[in-house]
Amino acid sequence: MEPLATTLCPQECTQTTRNETPNETTWSSEHVTKYTYISISLVICSLGLVGNGLLIWFLIFCIKRKPFTIYILHLAFADFMVLLCSSIIQLVNTFHIYDSTLVSYAVLFMIFGYNTGLHLLTAISVERCLSVLYPIWYHCRRPKHQSTVACTLLWALSVLVSGLENFFCILEVKPQFPECRYVYIFSCTLTFLVFVPLMVFSNLILFIQVCCNLKPRQPAKLYVIIMATVILFLVFAMPMKVLLIIGYYSNSTDASVWKSLPYLNMLSTINCSINPIVYFVVGSLRRKRSRKSLKEALQKVFEEKPVVASRENEVQFSLPL
């Protein structure tokens, strides 16, 4: 089993450098595969870095800080970290300048950002679900700094999980067993028995509540981006986590198991890159007659306007627009 850093490029990448006198046809085919993959990955990462960088800038300097935007800001930082570290690894594979320290830190922070994104998306889903089920509590009794405290705790949890995964499994040429297996039992429990079920269940409740309460109106934009972001994460980012757990937990040395890792990593970078696009597209909906700037679109999608309505002398809160 090879370290993760050496498997984040198609298998042809390492085969070519190890063969000193490869056949010309084979050499050409391997290099085409290698540089095509790296080029596409770098383009995706570059676009994602620009998009998340703009999103971070707008959220810090241009958009009023709200509970939900705090989560989105931290999620953008996590996505930016994943994209930056993935770019570094691809550049190392391109120029064959293998610095073990640089690559080790790049892999560490990439996994760190990935885990943080998973944790933050779960927190976002759960909180918005609570805001639908208990609107009065959310608007009146929610702790003022709950988002900041939650993000801090989730970053700390990601430090613990990522540190254990990297120390015992990912950065080792021969992962330390049974320690590595215990680490991935812990990671697997957190991921598939805690965070993913909470994420899916919260979004299912959110979807049902939005559809039932807003008929025949369209769903609130805020909830659309939450559900879209979660679906994209489950489709594009989760497969890499599943492969890592299967590979390291089973101590697999089968090359076929790791052959798909580079492409799953590419899907993960697509997930990190597409989130700002989702925010802008959803924020621009229903604006057919006027063009809205990026700032205006983001302000529209992140705004939360509790509307007070009276029915039988009771105060009810409508969903944010």
From Swiss-Prot:
Pfam families: 7tm_1. InterPro entries: GPCR_Rhodpsn, GPCR_Rhodpsn_7TM, MRGPCRFAMILY, MRGPCRH. One of its GO terms (molecular function) is G protein-coupled receptor activity. It comes from the Eukaryota. Residues 57-71, 127-147, 210-225, 272-320 are cytoplasmic. Residues 1-35, 93-102, 169-188, 247 are extracellular. One of its GO terms (biological process) is G protein-coupled receptor signaling pathway. The keyword Transmembrane helix applies. It is found in: Cell membrane. The chain crosses the membrane at residues 36-56, 72-92, 103-126, 148-168, 189-209, 226-246, 248-271. Glycans are attached at N23. GO terms for cellular component: plasma membrane. Keywords: Cell membrane, G-protein coupled receptor, Glycoprotein, Membrane, Receptor, Transducer, Transmembrane, Transmembrane helix. It is a multi-pass membrane protein. Belongs to the G-protein coupled receptor 1 family. Mas subfamily. Orphan receptor. May regulate nociceptor function and/or development, including the sensation or modulation of pain. This is Mas-related G-protein coupled receptor member H. It comes from Rattus norvegicus. The gene is Mrgprh.
